[in-house]
């Protein structure tokens, strides 16, 4: 299998490029609300995100990954290892090209949808439309529609409830001493549960809630409740409440970065692991082992992507859609995490990127339609709908060339 070695090197380079693009676009979402709400500076954001994305990818990334993401193609139709190699390179390169274009314009798009588009493109060229699992593709299309709508509704309702429980009371300071710990504690129930499922890859929601979520939520609630009874951050209730949520927002955003690294690194390393398995062991199955160095490569690529080019998407999500404060940023993080957790439990097709952007829109709508930058929202929605077809077309073209010259 020595003849495969050059293709392994090519795939590693392209996979690293894909990881970089994921960091520049998708990973930037994790810190966008914290930057937009001025909880942290852009420089602090890229440093925190870079470290946590790498940590999530290397230490918590799955040791076994799918060669064909989300079962989007029927694996029994691809028996030739060469096709898998050429297809992996074409899909990775196509997804990378599209992500770089989207990032250039500051458009947050789904990296999962990008790689799915790349896989569909080479699959159709190789074996026709019958190779595509159209049931799975229907789920992908549904996620375009469901994710932002559910995210927006959730954020709208949470923000309305939060403001009513604190800011609209006769004594906001007194109310915030009770309700701030409640909302933040509730958020940590979700974060603790998500840590078990998304980072530790646990299977039981009940175990996650009982042994991770509730203990984390109770500890945070008690610490905040007792602290605020001793000293409130400011005599001005609005400044005081925003100060409380500012500190929490750094933690919630950091968690999102950690979980993103653990999960979405597979979009970059899955095809690399597939080619590595073929080149070194002659394996060409649906699932393949992932060496630690490939996880490290993916994590490093994502971290560098956030640090060098993540500011464009951060600016769009954090500043251009609507004006954010710390309570609004917290609402977005909490709502997005809750929606993703429930969707994972129910098996619903959900895009985290779309949920986050939908939540930003929902928080803006809670203040009225005029609080939303409709031009930016329009551009983002268009970019979502063209992601799969554009990535598919680029991949089809590249795969055809590789099959001819390879």
From Swiss-Prot:
Q: Which residues cross the membrane?
A: 2-22, 45-65, 82-102, 115-135, 139-159, 182-202, 208-228, 288-308, 324-346, 385-405
Matching entries from Pfam families are given as: PHO4 (PF01384)
**Where does this one sit in the cell?**
Cell membrane
Its keywords, alphabetically, are: Cell membrane, Membrane, Phosphate transport, Transmembrane, Transmembrane helix, Transport
| Membrane topology, from the record | Multi-pass membrane protein
Citing just one GO molecular function, the answer is: phosphate transmembrane transporter activity
Q: What is its main location?
A: membrane
GO BP terms: phosphate ion transmembrane transport
Gene Ontology annotations for the cellular component aspect, listed alphabetically: plasma membrane
Q: Which PANTHER family match?
A: PHOSPHATE TRANSPORTER
Stated role: Potential transporter for phosphate.
Please report which protein family the annotation says this sequence is part of.
Belongs to the inorganic phosphate transporter (PiT) (TC 2.A.20) family.
Annotated protein name in UniProt: Putative phosphate permease TK2061
Q: Organism source for this protein? A: Thermococcus kodakarensis (strain ATCC BAA-918 / JCM 12380 / KOD1)
């Amino acid at each position: 299998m020595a003849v495969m070695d050059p293709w392994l090197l090519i795939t590693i380079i392209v996979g690293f490029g894909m990881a970089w693009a994921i960091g520049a676009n998708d990973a930037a979402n994790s810190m966008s609300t914290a930057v937009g709400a001025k909880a942290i500076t852009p420089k602090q954001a890229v440093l925190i995100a870079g470290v946590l994305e790498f940590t999530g990818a290397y230490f918590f990334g799955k040791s076994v990954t799918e060669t064909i993401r989300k079962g989007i193609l029927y694996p029994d139709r691809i028996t030739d290892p060469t096709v898998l190699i050429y297809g992996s390179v074409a899909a990775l390169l196509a997804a990378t090209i599209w992500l770089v274009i989207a990032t250039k314009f500051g458009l947050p798009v789904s990296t999962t949808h990008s790689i799915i588009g790349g896989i569909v493109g080479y699959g159709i060229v190789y074996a026709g439309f019958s190779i595509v699992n159209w049931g799975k593709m229907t789920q992908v299309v549904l996620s375009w529609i469901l994710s932002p709508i559910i995210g927006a509704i959730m954020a709208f309702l949470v923000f309305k409830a939060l403001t009513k429980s604190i800011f609209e009371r006769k004594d906001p300071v007194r109310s915030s001493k009770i309700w701030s710990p409640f909302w933040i504690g509730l958020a940590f129930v979700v974060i603790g549960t998500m840590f078990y499922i998304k980072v530790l890859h646990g299977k039981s929601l009940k175990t996650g809630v009982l042994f991770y979520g509730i203990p984390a939520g109770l500890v945070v609630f008690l610490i905040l409740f007792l602290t605020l009874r001793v000293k409130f951050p400011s005599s001005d209730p609005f400044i005081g409440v925003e100060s409380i949520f500012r500190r929490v927002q750094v933690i919630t955003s950091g968690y999102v970065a950690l979980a993103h690294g653990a999960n979405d690194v597979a979009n970059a390393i899955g095809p690399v692991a597939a080619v590595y398995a073929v080149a070194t062991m002659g394996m060409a199955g649906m699932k393949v082992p992932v060496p630690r160095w490939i996880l490290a490569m993916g994590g490093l690529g994502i971290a560098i992507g956030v640090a060098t080019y993540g500011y464009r998407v951060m600016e769009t999500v954090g500043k251009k859609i609507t004006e954010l404060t710390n309570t609004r940023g917290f609402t977005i993080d909490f709502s997005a995490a809750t929606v993703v957790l429930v969707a994972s439990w129910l098996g619903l097709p959900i895009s985290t990127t779309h949920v986050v952007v939908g939540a930003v829109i929902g928080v803006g709508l809670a203040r009225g339609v005029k609080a939303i930058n409709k031009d930016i929202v329009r551009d983002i929605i268009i970019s979502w709908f063209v992601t799969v077809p554009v990535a598919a077309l680029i991949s089809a073209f590249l795969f055809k060339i590789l099959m001819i010259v390879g």
